[in-house]
Amino acid sequence: MSYFEHIPAIRYEGPQSDNPLAYHHYDAEKRVLGKTMAEHLRIAVCYWHTFVWPGHDIFGQGAFQRPWQQPGDALERARLKADAAFEFFTKLGTPFYTFHDTDVAPEGDSLREYAANFARMVDYLGERQQASGVRLLWGTANLFSHPRFAAGAATNPNPDVFAWAATQVCHALDATHRLGGENYVLWGGREGYETLLNTDLKRERDQFARFLSMVVEHKHRIGFKGALLIEPKPQEPTKHQYDYDVATVHGFLVQYGLQNEIRVNIEANHATLAGHSFHHEIANAFALGVFGSVDANRGDPQNGWDTDQFPNSVEELTLAFYEILRHGGFTTGGMNFDAKVRRQSVDPEDLFYGHVGAIDVLALALERAAVLVENDRLDALRRQRYAQWDDAFGQKILSGGYTLQSLADDALARGVDPRHASGAQERLENIVNQAIYGLR
């Protein structure tokens, strides 16, 4: 008997259905702005929270009793986990999945064992992908869980740790390429510091940049055509991480000449931990030319840590999708659910409830964002606000037609006396509410 045998495939039944194991708003084939919902959303399920996390927290042991988490042969349990995962993906009807290397294969007791185990499981995942049609959105390497990475991976003071991390990324990037992955993600969970008293900031930044340059070189050497993505996060597990937010990552990439090689994977909960909105980080990524993909989840505003809950705010996601749609949508990226059920949600059905509800929220937000984009009054008002910069005077300033002195002389000669114009924030917020709630 399979783990999810008693659960039927999830189908679209419409908003009037009261079936908790059905989609009420997500109709994969429904067309929105010329593409299907499935094509717009590019939904992925993550391996780590869904099949690896045992339901523990810092105060208690694992609450889940998944068959693949029981004692036994490590590779056999990994295959059992993969079987359950692909059954889940197939029944949910999601086109993509994501993984860390050590999510899918046992790490073993040495680097050689790691490589051998991972190679076997990559073969098995390839078979499961071919049988199911489910594809890999992105792969990555876990460079944060093992104690060897306590002081970082690329930024570690020990070059042997750097070498171990490089080996994992080499194998994980090769595996992602072989499995047809469309992106490769680099999350520096331990690339930061606990105290400045023992930290050489310049050295660690240089090490991190060297590591990334090696990844870029390897990508091109093996012919991987997907995108390389850094996932920003300000802290946790370290006190301060070097990939703090989108702007910080972009500045780092520019400093080391990597801005044309690496983009960002934006997680909603990481944005809020950095003191930003999800909307801000996505808009900033597009403004800086580094938008890649999204981890869809949410945090708890009463908690100061990464709770990784399923997204449930149509309002928040509507603005996120508005930015994505008006910039042309995803290319290699997608909406990956970096989210987990709560520790008390121990039934197999709970995994479906979490994903089904979140996918419906994505669908609602996509449709509301499409309303904003179709008759883009927000953009019209935004362009009107900056219209004077498109006139001859504004263009002369931007094109270098003035020096600071000549501009000051011109302003004095003309007696410049600008008047303050309304930002119309309340009107703009009403437009958003009209799109979301159908208000008139």
Swiss-Prot record:
Active site: H100, D103
UniProt key word Mitochondrion: no
Biological process, per Gene Ontology: D-xylose metabolic process
Positions annotated to bind Mg(2+) 1: E231, E267, D295, D338
EC number(s) per entry: 5.3.1.5
Top EC class of this enzyme: isomerase
Highest taxon of source: Bacteria
Residue sites binding Mg(2+) 2 per the record: E267, H270, D306, D308
Location(s), subcellular: Cytoplasm
Cofactor requirements of the protein: Mg(2+)
Reaction catalyzed: alpha-D-xylose = alpha-D-xylulofuranose
Assigned keywords, A-Z: Carbohydrate metabolism, Cytoplasm, Isomerase, Magnesium, Metal-binding, Xylose metabolism
Cellular component, GO annotation: cytoplasm
UniProt xrefs under InterPro entries: Xyl_isomerase-like_sf, Xylose_isom_bac, Xylose_isomerase
Record's cofactor remark: Binds 2 magnesium ions per subunit.
Gene Ontology MF, one: xylose isomerase activity
Subunit structure: Homotetramer.
PANTHER family reported for this sequence: PTHR48408, XYLOSE ISOMERASE
Family: Belongs to the xylose isomerase family.
Name the record gives this protein: Xylose isomerase
Source organism (scientific name): Burkholderia ambifaria (strain ATCC BAA-244 / DSM 16087 / CCUG 44356 / LMG 19182 / AMMD)
